[in-house]
Each structure stands twice: as structure tokens, then as C-alpha cells.
Amino acid sequence: MKILYLSAYFQPEVTSSSYLSDNRNQAFAYRGYEMVVYTPMPTRGISEELRSEYKSRKTEIMYDGKMVVHRFNLMREGRNPITRALRYAISCIKQLYFGIFGKDARKCDMMFISSTPPIQGAMAAIVKKVRGIPMIYNLQDIFPDSLVGTGMTKKGSVLWKIGRVIENFTYRNADKIIVISEDFKQNIIEKGVPEDKIEVIYNWVDENAVVPIPKEKNDLFDELNISRDKFNVVYAGNFGHAQNIDIILKAAEKLKNNTEICFELFGTGGLKDHFINKAKELSLENIHFHPLQPYNRVSNVYSLADVGIVSCKKGIGKGAMPSKTWSILSAGTTVVANYDKGTDIENILTTNDIGLFSDANDIDAFVNAILKLYNDRELCKDMGVRGREFIINNLTKDIGTSKIINIVEQIKANIIR
């Protein structure tokens, strides 16, 4: 049984969800599935030297012969949204061709397609119609809702309407849709997707890769000159509109007279310089910005934290499920969330007593949550321990990949039947 991937990004590219793809592919190979991948030359998160190496590496065999990767030439990804959209469009056109006419693609029995970029699913749906093979759609980002949340468009706009047409076409043609939260499930049910087509599989964390590291053994403190004696509040991730970094700066401003509390922010993104300059304008000496760390140092990042922040712009929480939540918990660190009420994150944190929750944009509640844990270190420590236990019992790599394998087995059974 062969699975076809038409992927916008593939290793060695570095994205926040790279480990999920790697874990899933390892699981497929272990269970005997063969995989065929068509993907552009790598671009994201790699050096020009490494990209040059791959220009001559058109075909690659991986996972002990279980996967063949075909790479095609495509311009490097830039920051300009227009050129990025053009790159996505060209990539999808090429993948449409390969998906229909590619020699190895024509030997595949089903497709596993991710939701980045938003037109990826629609392209795969056309391949399905032509080839007559089933499609599993892995929905990591709800489009066009995500564009509304980041301020790129408004509900009811022409772009939004086009997005809804693309979204409906994709959902209608998918045989199974994997969503990463109950909020996502409810969202697409309200858009007319039958419930029996949807499977909720939370993004897992590799519990053996993201582990608690004692402060005295965490060399990141020394590398970045971060004090082990302070109460460290850590944010790691993208600096964009959706993450509501402003609420973190406001909290730092309210707590600037408490010299024992420091905010350590890791990441990248188009607005990072804006927030750095804003912190300078506010004369915030209790907030420090650091480069995004590679995945193999996630344990170090969250283990230097006494609490880890998960935040969002008000109104978009039900259209997102930050995987950093699981990384924070896997590192044995307590979560402080400033997020939309009524979401999965609120339910999981409060039900399992593994973090403190405040409504998005409620600065006073957010600051009080930080202060509560600062003043009660035993509570902070106990929540972190329970968070690690929650991951081990619910969101490990084996648990997550097994659920995906089960869906593939269901599709396989229908094909054989």
C-alpha cells in the first residue's frame, strides 16, 4: 500500500511542525507503508549552501527504502506575501501535474495532504477526482478564518469568499479530515462537514525529545546570560498579529518594578523588530528578546521557564491550537494562557490543573496569574509535574501516530473492499 504526499515543505526545511511529519513518516515506514513525495527544493529555515546541495539531489530514498522523495525546482521563499502566494501557486500547479501524471504517483493508493498552503487541499482534490484515489486531509490551519485572525482580510470580503469556496471544495472531496482540536471540529461542522468525516487528533509532542532539564544543567542560561535566580516568564514562537505579543509587553510594563520577574521571548516573525523597539520605548529592562532556537533545544528553552506563555489575539482562539502548549507541558513547565474563553486550551488547563487561564486581552487577570505562581512556587512546581504527566498519558508520539495509522487502516480497508 502506497501513500502519496504532495507537500509544500519537507525536510531538511525547518518549520514549527517538522517533527510531526518526521514522526508520522517513521510510523508509516515501521508499519510497512510505502510513501511517495513530490515537493519543491527546500527553502525555509536552511542556509543557501544547503539549498545548493539539494539542487542536484532531485530524487532521494529515505526510511530504509520505504519513501522516495522527488524534488522540483522552485524559487526561494521570500517574505513578501505576494511573491510567497505566487510561489505557492506555481508549486501547486507542478504538484497537480506530478500527482496526476508522475510515474511513482500513479502507483499510489491514497493521498495524505496537509493544509499548508490553503490551496493545497483543493489541488489534491482535483488529483483525487482525476485519479479516483481517496484523500486524507490534515487540517492544521482553518482558511480563510486564519486570514481574518491575522488581519489580512475581513469576513465577507472578496478574498474571504474565495477562501470559503476553496475550503468547501476541499472538505467535500476529502474522505477523512484530521483536525487538531475540538474547536476545529465544531468550526467545520458548522460549515456543513459531516461529523463522521472528522477525526480529532491533537498534535503530539515527542516526549523523549522535549523533557524537563534541571536549571543547574541547562546551559542556555549561561549562553544567553539569563539568571537562574529570577522568576522567568517565557514566550517562544512567532511574532505576528495573531499571537498578541502586545499583551506580554503590557504585562512586563505592569510588573517592571518587580525586579525578580523577567520576560524572556524567543522567536522570529515580521513584527519582532516592532516589539523590540516598543520595549525600548517603554524602557522595559525586564524583557529580553532572543533568536528562535532549533527543535533540539526546545527542552532548554521551556526548562529555563518557571511559566510558559500561550497567547492569542482576541477572537481567533477557536481557529488555532498552538502546539507550543504541549511542548511547555512536556518540559514540566506550567502554562499561563491568555486566550479566548470557551476553547480547548481553557478546558484542558483547568480540568487537569496544569496551568492558569485568563481571557484574551484581560491584562489584569493575566498579570494576576503570573503573580499567583510567582508567589506560590509549590503550586507552580506541582502544576508543571502534572503537565508532564498529562503529556505522557495523552499526547505522546506513539499515541498520536497510532491514531493516524488507524485512519489510514480504515481507508485501506475500504479500498480492499
Located regions from the model:
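Carbohydrate-associated surface elements
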Residues: 41, 183, 204
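Membrane-proximal helix-turn-helix segments that form the acceptor-binding/catalytic region
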Residues: 100, 119-122, 126-130, 157-179
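Nucleotide-sugar-dependent
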Residues: 243, 290, 294-301, 308-329, ...
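A short, well-ordered alpha-helix in the C-terminal region of glycosyltransferases
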Residues: 365, 372, 379-393
